[in-house]
Amino acid sequence: MTYSEFFAEIKGKFLEADVSNIKDHLTFQFNIIGEAQGIFYIELKNGKIRIEPYVYNDRDAMFTASPDTLKRIAEGKMDPIWAFTMQKLKVEGNIDKALRLKEIIDLKQKQTKKK
């Protein structure tokens, strides 16, 4: 899988999340290592989510993981806290804000179950 294919798939998964109740401004950068290597960011602002294939220099947190790990996290098949504990996910920056990633994934999972 190429980075472009991986990014399109992950973007689709995260865009499914209804973040309208999250009013905080949060920015996460994701560094993909190994196959499909690349960088993208997720920004939450005013209840909207934006995902772009660029570096975000003023990020709250930075996550580094393999494509498989990030895909499983985005699908709700792997808990990001467990992934961090098992050293499958590296986190740098504001840990309190980084933990909000789980909130976004949980919101997406609830919406998927309602469909």
Predicted regions and their residues:
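Feature captures hydrophobic
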Residues: M1-K115
